[in-house]
């Protein structure tokens, strides 16, 4: 690990700005969101990708984002404030929700509108299970972001479930496919359980939130 990343880890150990995240509200519709000002970074992913666990690790809080035993059950945009100008956005899990086609289509429309028209949205984190990356629904989310040039970073979560060589090969394949969708989109291996990949992710988040 480079000296600069070691320094970053030490700085975060002393002051992680995401520790101050607090739950603001859950929005069922875009009109329920706060005013379109400040900075928002959104987290998206299939219902079994480990999105809630990743948010809890990033914010160093055990139960900030509640993990559901029924994947896809909660269809709300959950907002967490860092300060009066910065918000983390937890988008509804997609892919396994046992809901009607009408509800799924409505939420697809809501998510696409949020990603493509929210002016204060500065970045999108897409979480995937490294063992099942880039499913059709993942690619749809990424394509919506690509259409408007929204900076996007993919977390291949649960990297601890694969051997190092297999994890590296999967990452290379995902990076190649991402480049075909948008040349500036990036990806990394990550494990919320083992807290691996935190330094790279934190650099990305701190930059988007203009902490550095």
Residue ranges and their predicted role:
Residues 2-98, 211:
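Conserved G1/Walker A P-loop phosphate-binding module
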Residues 63, 73-76, 103, 107, ...:
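Helical mechanochemical/support elements of P-loop NTPase systems and associated helical scaffolds
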Residues 40, 60-61, 104-107, 141-145, ...:
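Glycine-rich, phosphate-binding/catalytic loops in enzymes
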Residues 73, 86, 93-96, 131-134, ...:
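Conserved nucleotide-binding/hydrolysis micro-motifs of P-loop NTPases
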Residues 112-185:
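Conserved C-terminal guanine-recognition region of P-loop GTPase G domains, centered on the G4
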Residues 33, 71-78, 92-122, 130-144:
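Switch II of P-loop NTPase G domains
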Residues 41-49, 54-55, 70, 78-81, ...:
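Structured catalytic cores of enzymes that bind and process phosphorylated ligands/cofactors
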Residues 18-30, 161-212:
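Canonical P-loop GTPase G-domain recognition
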